[in-house]
Every structure is written in C-alpha cells, then in structure tokens.
C-alpha cells in the first residue's frame, strides 16, 4: 500500500471518529432528557428489560465485520456512560476487587457504574433491601461445581428480586509473588475454583496443601503475604495485586462458566426472551412433586433447572429452586404458577428477567 493511500485511509478514519464523537454527545444529551422524564415518572435509571431489547436489536441488525460480542462491548460502555449522565448507578458485589463477581458486574453495568465490594453474601442482600446500594451481583451456579448454596439461602428470605442474569466464562490461573513453582507449598482459592482445577492441581502440585478462601481475589491478596503460597484466580487479579502468572488456563474443562444474578427491588418487564426463577415446597406425601410440576408439561413450558435445598428449620425436608422459560406476567406462565400453587405449601416468585447472553 502506498503511503498516500494509507494517509487517505487514516484521514477518512479521523473524519468518522469526529462524526462518532458528535453522535455520542448528541446521544448523551438525549439520555439526559430521558433521565428527566424517568425522574418525573418515578422510573428506574437502570432498566434491565429495556437494555436487553436494545442489545438484541443491535446484534440483530449487525452486518459485520464487527462480531456481535464486540458490538455488545462497545454499546455496553456507551449505555453505561449515558446512565451516568442521568444518575450514577451503585452496585454491591462479592469482593474483594478483581473477584470473578466483580468482573461479571463490570461486564454487565459497564465502567461508569460505582462498585462496592462486600465480604459476605448477606451484606449484598442487606444493602439492596435497605437501598444502600440499589443493585447487587451474586454468583448462583458454576457449570462444573454446581450451585452456590450461600446465594440460595439468601434468596429464601430476601425481599429483593432477581432482575437480570450474567454468564461469565471462567479462565483460571496459578498466581504467585514469584516465578518459582518449586517454592509453592500452599494453594489458596475459593472452593469452587479449587474444584474446577482439581485434576490439574493433583497432577502438577500434588503435595501442596489447599486452603479455602471466600473468593479468588481474596486468595490473590493472601499470596502477597505468603512466599510459599500460590493462588488460583484470574489474570485480572494478577494485574490488580501485582502477582506473576505461573500457568494460565488450568481449569480441567475449557467450557467453564459461572452464572451470576443481578438483584434489586421491583420487577423486570417482559422482553419476549425471559426466564423466571421460583422457590417452592410441597406436602411430604407421595407424588406431591410430580403434581406440582405437571402444569409445566401441560402448558408446554420448558423447565430449565430444578434443585432441592434443605429446610434449616425442618430436618430432612426440602425447598425446591426452579428456573423456567417465560415471564410471570405472560398469560401462559401466570396460569402455570396459579395451577402450581394448588399443589404446593409454599411458592415464591424470585423474579422474571431477561435471558442472559452465554459467551
């Protein structure tokens, strides 16, 4: 390519950059007006259902060469910046900084939100319930290790609801304050992360003691003070805490993802591509669970997941968590819930919300 041709292309790119900048500021002015209207009508600045529709329309109209994920990433920050012009969004998450929950929160809300790490799951729910932070992000299940019981326990009692879901691909690294693997005697991490790379650790560090922590980011912080320790955490945690990456991609299965929930007050509106999560209990008699679930089959509503959870106050009795396709405000779904209620001793709608994008 000739130099003058490259110069011409760069000039055209520069002109497009200026036009994009003009349009972004024009969009910002419109966003401020939208914020004023929302304020007068008492509506939320962050509307998960509306944003899900925006992303679906953008990716549906995308003709390339930008891949859909790139389009989502770009517009995530545009929307995050527009929200910040209206009212700053504050989000509580299971910390510390650089945990996978922090990464999920950033991926969902964008960089212009304000993020507050919490050391315990209960504090996140308490913040949301008391409007200290109106939004929270919590892990609910991993594709390899299953459900996060702490989150399930909080969902039983909370007045907050599920407003959205986030899927995050998990890539695990072995981090240390040095590059000498032979010096490692202890491995720190969250129990789910340790489970996700169980075989790799057994083959490569069989004699190391494994120490459980509250999060992968906490493990990275512990390693700063332990020269004989290593952490199973993310590359972002290595950057945040100034650690070396000794090995990357140590998870036993590459298709490793964690699902997170966005919790908040109120309810998300239908988008046409939604999920609903419920919690229920049945009488302790033969066939009770079958009867409770029969309405799903009759209405041809797809049950995505069901799992039992022990009742703390009643030994050997269980609650059931279930996810299914559809929104509670839709006629067919509402009928299923009404019929199901006849066969349960307890039924709680945890929330209907837009289906998350699986990366």
Named regions from a protein language model:
Residues 1-359:
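Domain-level signature for soluble enzymes in the chorismate/prephenate branch of the shikimate pathway
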């Amino acid at each position: 390519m000739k130099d003058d041709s490259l110069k011409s292309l760069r000039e055209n790119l520069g002109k497009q950059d200026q036009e994009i900048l003009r349009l972004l500021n024009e969009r910002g002015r419109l966003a401020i007006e939208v914020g004023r209207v929302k304020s007068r009508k008492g509506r939320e600045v962050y509307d998960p259902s509306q944003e899900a529709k925006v992303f679906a329309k953008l990716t549906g109209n995308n003709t390339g060469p930008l891949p859909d994920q790139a389009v989502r990433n770009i517009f995530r920050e545009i929307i995050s910046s527009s929200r910040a012009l209206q009212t700053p969004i504050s989000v509580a998450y299971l910390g510390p900084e650089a945990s996978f929950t922090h990464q999920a929160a950033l991926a969902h809300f964008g960089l212009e939100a304000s993020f507050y790490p919490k050391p315990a799951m209960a504090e996140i729910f308490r913040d949301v319930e008391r409007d200290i932070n109106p939004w929270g992000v919590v892990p609910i299940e991993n594709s390899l290790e299953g459900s996060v019981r702490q989150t399930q326990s909080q969902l039983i009692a909370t007045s907050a609801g599920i407003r959205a879901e986030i899927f995050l691909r998990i890539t695990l690294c072995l981090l240390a304050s040095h590059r000498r693997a032979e010096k490692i005697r202890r491995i720190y991490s969250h129990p789910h992360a340790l489970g996700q790379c169980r075989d790799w650790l057994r083959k490569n560090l069989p004699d190391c003691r494994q120490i459980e922590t509250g999060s992968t980011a906490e493990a990275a912080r512990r390693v700063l003070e332990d020269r004989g320790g290593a952490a199973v955490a993310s590359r972002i945690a290595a950057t945040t805490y100034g650690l070396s990456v000794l090995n990357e991609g140590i998870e036993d299965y590459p298709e490793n993802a964690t699902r997170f929930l966005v919790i908040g007050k109120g309810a998300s509106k239908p988008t046409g591509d939604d999920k609903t999560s419920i919690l229920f209990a049945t009488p302790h008699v033969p066939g009770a669970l079958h009867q409770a679930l029969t309405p799903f089959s009759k209405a041809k509503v797809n049950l995505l997941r069901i799992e039992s959870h022990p009742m703390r106050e009643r030994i050997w009795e269980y609650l059931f968590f279930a996810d299914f396709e559809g929104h509670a405000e839709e006629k067919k779904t509402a009928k299923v819930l009404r019929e199901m209620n006849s066969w349960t001793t307890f039924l709680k709608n945890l929330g209907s919300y837009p289906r998350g994008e699986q990366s």
